Amino acid sequence: MSSVIHAVNLKIGYSPDSILGEIDNLEIEQGEIVSIVGESGIGKTTFLKSIARLVNPISGTLKVFDTEGVSARGVIGYIPQKLGLIKHETVYSNVLEGAICNESILRSISGFHEEKVIDKVKETIELMNLSDKIDEPVKRLSGGQQRRVAIARTIAQGPKLILADEFLSELDDKTVENVWKSMLEYVTSNNITLVIVEHNIERARLAERCFKLEKNEESDYSILSEVKI
């Protein structure tokens, strides 16, 4: 397997004066499913944003698909806590937005393959069990349904790496089971790497490997280490 995320002596935060966490050595391979746990405010979201290059690392090495710049963004799908959906638009329109934000898909549209994009959008909506809501404005959906729209929008981008921040929150146990099953089928069949932030330990156990961010007694910031849960 090839390395997707490679971090060495990495410090994360929003400025050198407010370092939140340190990652001494981390390797995540293609196709792995990994969870990150830790107390609220410990730096889990900041770590995901650093991987996605939405936040620049303070220091150290962070390579995603063997690059340290923003060029990997096109193959990274990010599901944030705040979903950022267009509430007055339909489910279809929101998922379509995810599909066409990928530059390679835009090129395929100009090459008269628009029907492939439409098929991809509909398949992704079906994967998240939203076909009966396809023409509904997002604002009319429940919180759990809106979260499934956000997941579908990310999948429609065709990413090789998915970063999911509490992506199972606001879902009841049965829906969690169904959404996780659909996500697992998708990432395993497409050899996609999935990194999830979770506060729920039972849900974190669904991953193959788990890492914990926790305060280091010798410093003011947290340290990432692999744990068994």
Task: Please give the residue ranges for each predicted region.
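A short, flexible loop at the N-terminus of ABC-type nucleotide-binding domains that lies
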Residues: M1-A7, K11-D24
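Conserved ABC transporter NBD signature motif
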Residues: G60-G74
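Conserved ABC ATPase signature
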Residues: P137-L141, Q145
